[in-house]
Every structure is written in C-alpha cells, then in structure tokens.
Amino acid sequence: HSPESKITTIDRNPEMIGFAKENFAKFDNRQQITLLEGDAVDVLSTLTETYDFVFMDSAKSKYIVFLPEILKHLEVGGVVVLDDIFQGGDIAKDIMEVRRGQRTIYRGLQRLFDATLNNPGLTASLVPLGDGILMLRKNQAEIELPDVD
C-alpha cells in the first residue's frame, strides 16, 4: 500500500496494451499508473521525470541501448532490475556455441555486462533467479557507459 507511489510503464505490443488498459481500469482506483505507448527507444527520450526503481523486461539485445537513457532518469540510489539476462544459460558459453539466431542477443548482453559489472558508478548484482536478474544501483549522478553504437 503506497498511496504516494506512481508507476510509469512503456509497451508497444497492441495486445499487451489492451490487456494493461483493462487491468488498470479495474484495479488502478487511485490512477497511479501511466501507460506510455510506443517503442521504448523513442519513448524514453521524451521522459521528464525521475524514478527510484525501473524494471526492464524487453528485447534483451536492447538492454544496453536503453540503459543510458534510463540512467539519466534514475535517482542516485535508485535501482534498475533487468530480467532474463542469462539467456537460458547461453551467456556463459563461447559465442561459437550459441545458435546463430541468438547471437545478437548474446552480444547485446555481453556489452551490457561489460558496461555495468565493474562500473564504479554502479553497484551490480547478478541474481540466479529464474533466467537471471541483473540488479543495478546508481551510486552517482553521472554514469559513464561505453558507446552503444
């Protein structure tokens, strides 16, 4: 029960958007949830608020693309949780052992790990829950990440 809390969610899938709207209409009596429709890469750059907590469950290869913009909007001391980061165990393999169709995801996740696990501006924790969670705590206002291009 957090009457002061606000939730902002981003989705681009029309079916999931419809499902979310139905549920928010039924259960969001205090109107604490804002649904932003569109691709996260476009929507994130339009945000003006800051956040204490961000949960990411999207295209795994895009986590590293979304992260710089998310960190801009995350309060110092805030936490980002990234879901399903072990890629069914593939992430621990050599890239040549990963199926060709999964290699873009593999590369994106490797870039994410390279950018975050030893970053002095972040505290990173890998949690072996389900298909893996990466928890990042923002320790300072400015976080330097390698270029994502």
Which residues are covered by each model-predicted region?
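S-adenosylmethionine/decaboxylated-SAM
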Residues: 1-149
